[in-house]
């Protein structure tokens, strides 16, 4: 059998017009209640079915196809007041309608199903096997919550599924339990305006996933291991100084105020999230700073690292969650080496971390946009090595040390129109460099991340400018003191 279903922009499904409502007939008062019908279908089977679903309600229509549909239900009693558990099995291929794909996703369900009756809604307990289901086909349903376009994402899951819907007034809601392995593969996401590559990866494997949710209970999520392979991320600081990844999910719009007084809704219980070791394999990050003029971009490649287990749980009330061990290695701009290590917790609120980073032999000329903004000169040649240590306390207090080694630094001519202080930076470089042309600078930095005026990069460059000023004036101060000036 083949079925084509469509929902128009007004939300009406065309199948609703297939059946005419039964005429209302008066029931004679006999004084006796009619015996309810009892129907039992021992075995119902459907083979080789297909379903086409088109939905015009979202701004971008949804087009989904299901074929090779095989369904078997046993002990079906549709009129029973108390529904039995019915053995059910389903196999199907699922594809995104309108796209050419040789191998669509596959879905297999094998378990028991119970139909709604009384206060009990639909319930299902089964083994579920989903292979490369086209999640991107459903993107129009949540597109209004995302500041990105999901071009492709294939979702897989293998494990158990238990779900039930309660219709009772005392504890209504959905109960869901998952236990198995999940994957999100071949993800491709672009920014909306302008359309630029934003995120992609070959494989995100989530092994040993356990998820439980129930009415009036906290959401619990536990993962044994996570592996992200062959991934890319574009990180952009926009002209207003915002980082693009912070705004990928739009905040929920507030509900319209009600004129009717209502009892406050109970506060949602905080979730319990526990994540095992995370591995990052063969990553690449393209960093673009559009806050600086001219713009600056850097390409980080061969990024491989690991993060140990972490959670949002606290040992005692008021105590921050424990930090996880971090290690990350890679290359910057193809030649410089990058090594990051330390401790952090992505789930900690507020943010807390203690990390160290080492960069060796980064070519300096690409950093000219920063030197033009803060020193007024472009960079002709030189290499940069950096040892940094950053520690952020739960109260937002930052303590950082920055050891900066500049090797064979050479500035060009002053850039016309630069608003940076007009300092003789070439003289300062000559005074700061040793006999081998190496400048070694140590810049401690501290401040509060809760201060909206606190910006780390400009602060470091201002410190360098101040250091240049001191380097220039120091020899003359020494000469003046020698002659009693």
Over which residues does each language-model region extend?
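Secondary-structure transition motifs
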Residues: 1-71, 148-152, 173-174, 189-305, ...
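Extracellular/lumenal and peripheral-membrane lipid-interaction modules
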Residues: 2, 120-161, 192, 226, ...
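Transmembrane beta-strands of outer-membrane beta-barrel pores
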Residues: 2, 50, 94-96, 115, ...
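Flexible, solvent-exposed coil segments and beta strand-coil junctions
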Residues: 26-27, 49, 82-89, 136-142, ...
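Low-complexity, intrinsically disordered
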Residues: 90-94, 328-332
């Amino acid at each position: 059998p083949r079925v084509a279903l469509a929902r128009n922009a007004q939300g009406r499904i065309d199948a609703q017009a297939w059946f005419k409502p039964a005429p209302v007939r008066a029931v004679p008062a006999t004084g006796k209640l009619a015996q309810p019908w009892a129907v039992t279908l021992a075995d119902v089977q459907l083979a080789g079915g297909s379903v086409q679903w088109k939905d015009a309600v979202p701004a971008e229509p949804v087009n989904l196809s299901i074929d090779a549909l095989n369904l078997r239900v046993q002990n079906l009693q549709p009129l029973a007041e108390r529904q039995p558990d019915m053995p059910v099995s389903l196999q199907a291929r699922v594809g995104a309608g309108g796209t050419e794909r040789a191998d669509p996703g596959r879905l297999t369900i094998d378990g028991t199903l119970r139909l709604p009756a009384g206060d009990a809604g639909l319930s299902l307990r089964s083994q579920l096997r989903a292979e490369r289901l086209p999640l991107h086909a459903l993107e129009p349903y949540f597109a209004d919550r995302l500041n990105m376009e999901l071009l492709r994402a294939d979702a897989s899951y293998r494990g158990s599924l238990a779900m039930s819907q309660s219709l009772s007034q005392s504890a209504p809601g959905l109960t869901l339990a998952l236990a198995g392995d999940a994957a999100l593969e071949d993800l491709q996401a672009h920014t909306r305006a302008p359309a630029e590559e934003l995120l992609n990866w070959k494989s995100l494997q989530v092994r040993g996933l356990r998820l439980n949710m129930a009415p009036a209970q906290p959401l619990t999520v536990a993962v044994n291991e996570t592996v992200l392979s062959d991934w890319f991320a574009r990180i952009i600081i926009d002209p207003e100084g915002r980082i693009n990844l912070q705004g990928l999910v739009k905040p929920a719009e507030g509900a319209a105020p009600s004129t009717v007084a209502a009892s406050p809704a109970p506060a949602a219980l905080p979730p319990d999230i526990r994540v095992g070791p995370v591995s990052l394999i063969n990553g690449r990050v393209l960093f673009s700073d559009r806050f600086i003029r001219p713009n600056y971009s850097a390409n980080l490649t061969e990024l491989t690292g690991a993060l140990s287990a972490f959670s949002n749980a606290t040992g005692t009330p008021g105590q921050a969650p424990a930090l996880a061990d971090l290690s990350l290695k890679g290359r910057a701009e193809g030649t410089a080496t990058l090594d990051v290590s330390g401790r952090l917790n992505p789930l900690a609120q507020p943010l807390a971390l203690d990390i160290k980073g080492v960069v060796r032999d980064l070519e300096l000329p690409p950093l000219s946009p920063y030197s033009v903004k803060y020193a007024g000169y472009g960079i002709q040649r030189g290499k940069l090595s950096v040892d940094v240590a950053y520690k952020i306390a739960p109260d937002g207090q930052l303590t950082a040390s920055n050891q900066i080694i500049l090797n064979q630094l050479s500035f060009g001519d002053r850039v016309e129109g630069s608003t940076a202080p007009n300092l003789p930076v070439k003289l300062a470089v000559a005074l700061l460099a040793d006999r081998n042309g190496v400048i070694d600078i140590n810049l401690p930095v501290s401040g509060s991340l809760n201060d909206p005026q606190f910006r780390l990069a400009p602060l470091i460059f201002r410190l360098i400018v101040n250091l240049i000023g001191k380097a220039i004036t120091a020899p003359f101060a020494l000469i003046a003191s020698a002659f009693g000036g």
